[in-house]
Amino acid sequence: MEKIYSAPITVLGAGSYGTALAIALSRNGHKTYLWGHNPQKMAQMAVRRMSEEFLPDIPFPEALEIESDLATALTRSKDILIVVPSHVFSEVLQQIQPLLTSEHRIMWATKGLERDTGRLLQEVALQILGDRYPLAVLSGPTFAKELAQGLPTAIALSSTDPQFADEMQQRIHCSKAFRVYLNSDMVGVQLGGAIKNVIAIGTGISDGMGFGANARTALITRGLAEISRLGLSLGANPTTFIGMAGLGDLVLTCTDNQSRNRRFGLMLGQGRNAQEAMAEIGQVVEGFYNTKEAYLLAQKQGIEMPIVEQIYQILFCGKHASDVAKTLLGRERKGE
């Protein structure tokens, strides 16, 4: 009988997704420590044994413990799972760097590119932490609420260290509800999770303008082609983009209104401005921040990404969505 790896794990980030992952891990029987940056909210979660803000009515398993002190949270486990918005990812790494020991291993489920540089988060981690620690990324089609409810979910995991990857797969995988696929392509897994948010904004805009299912499907398909082109230029494996971290995450985010990025796009397509849309959503819209970085990265790599470019024009250059539709439809004829 296969020996199942089990050890405590610390989750940094008590938003909806971080909390959902902590619930899933602890439900699997692993002692899990959840840290968040707001001590008052963490104290409330500890008392009420649930996240009333993000996941109301989903009680915490017994194995889930709330921790409000970062230094203490890092001593609880050698394995750290970071689940924070991409624009604060480097800040969190800088906070934990002096507190880490040689035994720590770092994984993240953050999806995005570094703000203002467009770098993959692995590059950010290597710059701040050096190459002392095994690194891993968890990415794929997962909505926090469904994960926390224990509904069937599948995801991809990639790591710089095969043993770390295998042990984390065993720990996260649950035959009843949560399936984890290993993928050796860290570049592709990270990129798919970042750029799909941008495409989801585009499909939301299209649906908000009433363009229908045909247009939505065209945007998803051509968006996948754009992600693949950019990925290949960065050394990714093309098969990654037809897997969980590519097509899987893209389809989920572009077609279901649980996606904040899609809802953000819907509001833009209905005539709301970006500030109004983000205020109504009330949580981080990763695609808004990553549109600029994706556009600049494509320019740097010399890769044609017309959908990403036009969403950038809407968000940062004041272009109207109806003009974007004309631009995309009026492009020169070409082969697929």
Curated annotation (Swiss-Prot):
Keywords: Cytoplasm, Lipid biosynthesis, Lipid metabolism, NAD, NADP, Nucleotide-binding, Oxidoreductase, Phospholipid biosynthesis, Phospholipid metabolism
An example Gene Ontology molecular-function term: NAD binding
Localization, UniProt: Cytoplasm
Disulfide bonds: none
Active site residues of this protein: K196
Alphabetical list of Gene3D superfamilies matching this protein: N-(1-d-carboxylethyl)-l-norvaline Dehydrogenase, domain 2, NAD(P)-binding Rossmann-like Domain
Cellular-component GO terms for this entry: cytosol
Residues where sn-glycerol 3-phosphate binds: K111, G140, T142, K196, D249, S259, R260, N261
Top-level EC class as recorded in UniProt: oxidoreductase
Pfam families listed in its UniProt record: NAD_Gly3P_dh_C (PF07479), NAD_Gly3P_dh_N (PF01210)
Pathway as given in its UniProt record: Membrane lipid metabolism; glycerophospholipid metabolism
Binding site for NADPH: S16, Y17, H37, K111, A144, R260, V284, E286
Biological processes, Gene Ontology terms: carbohydrate metabolic process; glycerol-3-phosphate biosynthetic process; glycerol-3-phosphate catabolic process; glycerophospholipid biosynthetic process
Catalytic activity, EC: 1.1.1.94
SUPFAM superfamilies in UniProt: 6-phosphogluconate dehydrogenase C-terminal domain-like (SSF48179), NAD(P)-binding Rossmann-fold domains (SSF51735)
Domain of life: Bacteria
Catalyses which reaction(s): sn-glycerol 3-phosphate + NAD(+) = dihydroxyacetone phosphate + NADH + H(+); sn-glycerol 3-phosphate + NADP(+) = dihydroxyacetone phosphate + NADPH + H(+)
Functional summary from the UniProt entry: Catalyzes the reduction of the glycolytic intermediate dihydroxyacetone phosphate (DHAP) to sn-glycerol 3-phosphate (G3P), the key precursor for phospholipid synthesis.
Record-stated family: Belongs to the NAD-dependent glycerol-3-phosphate dehydrogenase family.
Protein name: Glycerol-3-phosphate dehydrogenase [NAD(P)+]
Gene behind this protein: gpsA
